[in-house]
Design a protein with these regions (language model features):
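Nucleic-acid-interacting cores, centered on viral/eukaryotic replication and modification enzymes
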Residues: 1, 67, 137
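Non-heme Fe(II)/2-oxoglutarate
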Residues: 1-58
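Short beta-strand-to-loop capping motifs
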Residues: 6, 81, 132-134
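Short, charged, solvent-exposed linker or helix-capping segments at domain edges/interfaces
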Residues: 43, 48, 88-92, 141-145
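Catalytic core of non-heme Fe(II) oxygenases with the double-stranded beta-helix
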Residues: 51-115, 128
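Acyl-donor (CoA/ACP) binding surface of acyl/acetyltransferases
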Residues: 117-120, 125
Length: 149
């Protein structure tokens, strides 16, 4: 479900307040989640690091993210800039049963299985990270079972 990667740190990235000044392109509840395009310098670095990928974005998460499946991708490469609290946990689920729970460290690349239902719990402030993936046009959009679109 999670694999830590020994990859170089991004040479540049925006601070949280600068990210929030960008356009939030998320189509769902923008109070709890945001997606923002990375600037060109960071995108070029990420394209070199992940040549198979075509999406390079910042994510901003707040408390209240429901269990969900990222159905527009199977694998995500993430780099957490700000954890969002001291005990923020990523939890994977199978039919309501917990499979695995972990606290992901800041400033460490990881490969994340986004095709299994998961949740982000105990966010106290804002969780901010860089998210990289290959878009699957046949998969559709995020599925939040408890959120109407």
């Amino acid at each position: 479900m999670i694999e830590f990667l020994d990859l170089p740190d991004p040479p540049c990235f925006l601070d949280t307040e600068s990210i929030k000044l960008k356009e939030n392109i998320w189509i769902g509840n923008k109070e709890i989640y945001g997606i923002y395009y990375c600037e060109d310098e960071l995108t070029n670095f990420l394209k070199h690091l992940f040549p198979e990928c075509d999406n390079f974005k910042y994510q901003l998460l707040r408390n209240g993210i429901p269990k969900h499946v990222d159905v527009d991708r199977a694998i995500n490469y993430n780099y957490i800039l700000q954890a969002g609290g001291n005990n923020v946990e990523t939890v994977w689920w199978d039919n309501g049963k917990e499979l695995y729970r972990t606290c992901l460290p800041e400033k460490k690349w990881h490969k994340f299985n986004a095709s299994i239902e998961h949740s982000i719990e105990n966010i106290e402030t804002e969780r901010v990270g860089i998210s990289v993936f290959k878009y699957d046009s046949n998969a559709g959009w995020w599925h939040y079972p408890d959120e109407s679109r």
